[in-house]
Curated annotation (Swiss-Prot):
This is 3-deoxy-manno-octulosonate cytidylyltransferase. It comes from Histophilus somni (strain 129Pt). Activates KDO (a required 8-carbon sugar) for incorporation into bacterial lipopolysaccharide in Gram-negative bacteria. It holds the Pfam family CTP_transf_3. Its main location: cytoplasm. The lineage of its organism: Bacteria, Pseudomonadati, Pseudomonadota, Gammaproteobacteria, Pasteurellales. It is found in: Cytoplasm. It is an enzyme of class 2 (transferase).
Length: 256
């Protein structure tokens, strides 16, 4: 199947400035992400950036780059600009991989594209089971709840569903004894959409729920569209948000 991967690579980061160019095993981080996307079988891989040094690095390893505005409020807005500039057809499948995911498994890149095509929805994504109590209660871990067919009911930074009886019985002091049931899933921030849907998405105004949760995918649910979720065939390792994350990834790739 044909699909295009777009990798937003924003240079300015409050926690780790310049991270697309951070050296990992002798290559800039963005090159690792690009290589994983290439290995997925994508028809085309484009890096979208607002910083010339990142663009120069991408050209240096023969990657395709699209310069974008630095004024975007979200990665989805950056995707929409790329689609317009490159005249990508409305029915083209677009997979969005974040530029700070140098360990993303290529198999899940193709999986999310196939998920979109299989279920004939405008947007698809992936999740993995939560098996750790600390992860469950971590607001930086986005939880996703679906119906019986895998269509999203809600995304939240809070614990969903809330196991009332078990939580009340254990109390905060005994959460280590919590029995995690099969309905707890961590959302993986990789998406597939039709190009035309991305153009539609950016026409919608930000919604109350997405502003409260700081999760832009809630705009899709608010406007009555469906998102399908599959369990990822392979759980991705850590992304790079902090210096500590960067050191973990460097350690992993130094042994590859």
């Amino acid at each position: 199947m044909n699909f295009t991967v777009i990798i937003p690579a924003r240079y300015a980061s409050s926690r780790l400035p310049g991270k697309p160019l951070a050296d990992i095993a002798g290559k800039p981080m963005i090159q690792h992400v690009w290589e994983k996307a290439q290995q997925s079988g994508a028809t085309r891989v484009v890096v979208a950036t607002d910083y010339e040094e990142v663009a120069r690095a991408v050209r240096g390893f023969d990657g395709e780059v699209c310069m974008t505005s630095s004024q975007h409020n979200s990665g989805t807005e950056r995707l929409a600009e790329v689609i317009e500039k490159l005249a990508i057809p409305d029915d083209e499948i677009i997979v969005n991989i974040q530029g700070d995911e140098p360990l993303v498994p290529p198999v899940i890149v193709s999986q999310v594209a196939q998920n979109l095509q299989k279920y004939q929805v405008n947007m698809a994504t992936l999740a993995v089971k939560i098996e750790d109590v600390e992860e469950l209660f971590n607001p930086n871990v986005v939880k996703v709840l679906t119906d019986k067919d895998g269509y999203v009911l809600y995304f939240s930074r809070a614990v969903i569903p809330w196991d009332r009886d078990q939580f009340v019985q254990l109390g905060k002091a005994d959460l280590s004894q919590l029995q995690l049931h099969q309905h707890y899933f961590r959302h993986i921030g990789i998406y597939a959409y039709r190009a035309g849907f991305i153009k539609q998405y950016v026409q919608w105004q930000p919604t109350t729920l997405e502003q409260i949760e700081r999760l832009e995918q809630l705009r899709v649910l608010w406007n009555g569209e469906r998102i399908h979720v599959e369990l990822a065939k392979q759980a991705p390792a850590v992304g790079v948000d902090t210096v500590e994350d960067l050191e973990k990834v460097r350690s992993i790739l130094s042994h590859v």
